[in-house]
């Protein structure tokens, strides 16, 4: 599909591709940006993002059992109000699917606004853990792009050292355990 196509990535034209992925039981990583090409500007980023989540929810219902990861986190900056991230309730709907995971990498979106260790992000990270579960959250680096805001170690230490509300088991899930399970990697 190109930007001029009215079809979305879940269209009938792509059904054979998705059916093959489903048969192979491969994990899928989706980056939701709230539209493609000129469609991005047809409505607000917030509305477009939620609409794209609904497309993903339909896809998840069509292909149950596949592990899916929403990459790059949620649209943190779109919902930033007075220094706090305030998501609407419906942003959590796709995570009602037990196989939908969330990759979190705060520095790439918020590094220009907040300083390490990004304490301002902790309330929304805590909420994500409460709503989704650490066993469905994956730490992401976005290296080398994130290096303009922090080191690799700092990005990792956000979850290894900071976020005091996390248990040791939750930390292990977020910084590797969840990704290992999604990818089918066993020790």
Task: Give the location of each predicted region.
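A metal-dependent hydrolase metal-coordination microenvironment
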Residues: 1
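Generic preference for well-ordered secondary structure
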Residues: 54, 86, 121-123, 143, ...
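Conserved, mostly hydrophobic/aromatic
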Residues: 21, 102, 142, 171, ...
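Catalytic pocket-lining loop regions of alpha/beta-barrel enzymes
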Residues: 4-138
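Short Gly/Pro-enriched loop/turn and capping motifs at secondary-structure junctions
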Residues: 108-109, 143-146
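Mid-to-C-terminal alpha-helical segments outside catalytic/metal-binding sites
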Residues: 126-127, 131-138, 147-187
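Residue-level detector of flexible, active-site-proximal loop/helix-junction positions
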Residues: 75-77, 144, 181
